[in-house]
């Protein structure tokens, strides 16, 4: 699946005293299998943007072209998947393939645990697939499969989701999206409110899904997470995309991040301090990378002393 965003703008309450332009001439493309972080200060347009990717919102100007395999609607009894494209744009007509788009592009919003509502975890996970026309039998099979993938025991299926901790509820919400088998997975602040261990476990799940070919997009203020896990970073500010590139290249510019109200990754701040003192390290994306680089630097320094 591919998504191409063509010069979209979004205006809320147009021609009114409270008119507000949330997105301004945004053009981006997304390929299957990418792992992307979307960053930017509060109110920069990040959440509004991701709402456009599966037609929860439509642009005021511009369009979004989604290319992939969609069910052929001509034969509703025995639909087959065919290569086609869907164009999302401002229209009064009903958007074709809307269910297919939302099946293939799943979004988990911040504090998704508050979206749980069924009496059991099994029913909550199965709700999405059933609403898309999947049989109950198949939906419950998927619930059993995906609760394990998100790291919860199978015997939780008959429990009420409201008995769980915040982190566990978020895993159930994630399982519900995965049960619809999307190609694109989009998460809005997925680690907000989680402790370090919970954050690590959620990010490891995302990494595994990406390694299996899923496109993973995370909206995050935590640039340490973006640095360690994602390969591409898109930077929003005031409704514009101000940077789009390899994650390390975008986040390494510590001064640029601060100028745009973002706290740089701690590792790269420390790396820059060392660099200013003449200690040059290669690219570091994690604590493990940093420790390895420091050890290598010290070994090289000690060998140089011995030779002298």
Swiss-Prot record:
As for subcellular location, the record says: Cell membrane
Keyword Ribosomal protein among UniProt keywords: no
Where primarily located? membrane
EC number assigned by the record: 7.-.-.-
Which top-rank group of organisms is this from? Bacteria
Residues binding ATP:
40-47
Q: What does the record say about its membrane topology?
A: Peripheral membrane protein
Q: Report the InterPro entries cross-referenced here.
A: AAA+_ATPase, ABC_transporter-like_ATP-bd, ABC_transporter-like_CS, ABC_transpr_CbiO/EcfA_su, ECF_ABC_transporter_ATP-bd, EcfA2, P-loop_NTPase
- Keywords associated with the record: ATP-binding, Cell membrane, Membrane, Nucleotide-binding, Translocase, Transport
Q: Which GO terms describe its cellular component?
A: ATP-binding cassette (ABC) transporter complex
Please tell me whether the keyword Repressor is annotated for this protein.
Answer: no
Outline the extent of the ABC transporter domain.
3-263
Q: Which GO terms describe its molecular function?
A: ATP binding; ATP hydrolysis activity; ATPase-coupled transmembrane transporter activity
Function (record text)? ATP-binding (A) component of a common energy-coupling factor (ECF) ABC-transporter complex. Unlike classic ABC transporters this ECF transporter provides the energy necessary to transport a number of different substrates.
Subunit comment for this entry? Forms a stable energy-coupling factor (ECF) transporter complex composed of 2 membrane-embedded substrate-binding proteins (S component), 2 ATP-binding proteins (A component) and 2 transmembrane proteins (T component).
User: Which NCBIfam families is this protein grouped with?
Assistant: ECF_ATPase_2, PRK13651.1
Which family is it part of?
Belongs to the ABC transporter superfamily. Energy-coupling factor EcfA family.
Name of this chain's protein = Energy-coupling factor transporter ATP-binding protein EcfA2
Q: Which organism is it from?
A: Mycoplasma mobile (strain ATCC 43663 / 163K / NCTC 11711)
Q: What is the gene called?
A: ecfA2
């Amino acid at each position: 699946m591919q998504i191409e965003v063509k010069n979209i703008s979004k205006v809320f309450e147009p021609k009114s005293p409270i008119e507000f332009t949330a997105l301004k001439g945004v053009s981006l493309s997304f390929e299957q299998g990418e792992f992307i972080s979307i960053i930017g200060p509060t109110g920069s347009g990040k959440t509004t943007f991701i709402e456009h990717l599966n037609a929860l919102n439509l642009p005021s100007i511009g369009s979004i072209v989604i290319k992939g395999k969609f069910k052929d609607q001509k034969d509703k009894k025995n639909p087959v998947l065919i290569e086609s494209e869907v164009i999302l744009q401002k229209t009064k007509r009903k958007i074709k393939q809307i269910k297919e788009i939302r099946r293939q592009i799943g979004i988990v919003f911040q504090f998704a645990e508050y979206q749980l509502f069924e009496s059991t975890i099994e029913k909550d996970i199965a709700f999405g697939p059933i609403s898309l026309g999947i049989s109950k039998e198949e939906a419950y099979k998927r619930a059993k499969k995906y609760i394990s993938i998100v790291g919860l025991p199978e015997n939780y299926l008959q429990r009420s989701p409201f008995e769980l901790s915040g982190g566990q509820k978020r895993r159930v919400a994630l399982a519900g999206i995965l049960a619809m088998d999307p190609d694109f997975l989009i998460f809005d602040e997925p680690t907000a409110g989680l402790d370090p261990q919970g954050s690590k476990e959620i990010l490891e799940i995302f990494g595994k899904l990406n390694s299996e070919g899923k496109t993973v997009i995370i909206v995050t203020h935590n640039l340490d997470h973006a640095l360690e896990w994602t390969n591409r970073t898109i930077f929003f500010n005031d409704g514009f995309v101000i940077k789009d590139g390899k994650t390390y290249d975008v986040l390494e510019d510590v001064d640029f991040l601060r100028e745009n109200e973002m706290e740089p990754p701690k590792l790269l701040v420390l790396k820059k301090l060392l660099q200013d003192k003449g200690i040059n390290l290669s690219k570091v994306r994690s604590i493990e990378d940093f420790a390895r680089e420091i050890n290598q630097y010290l070994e090289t320094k000690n060998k140089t002393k011995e030779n002298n």
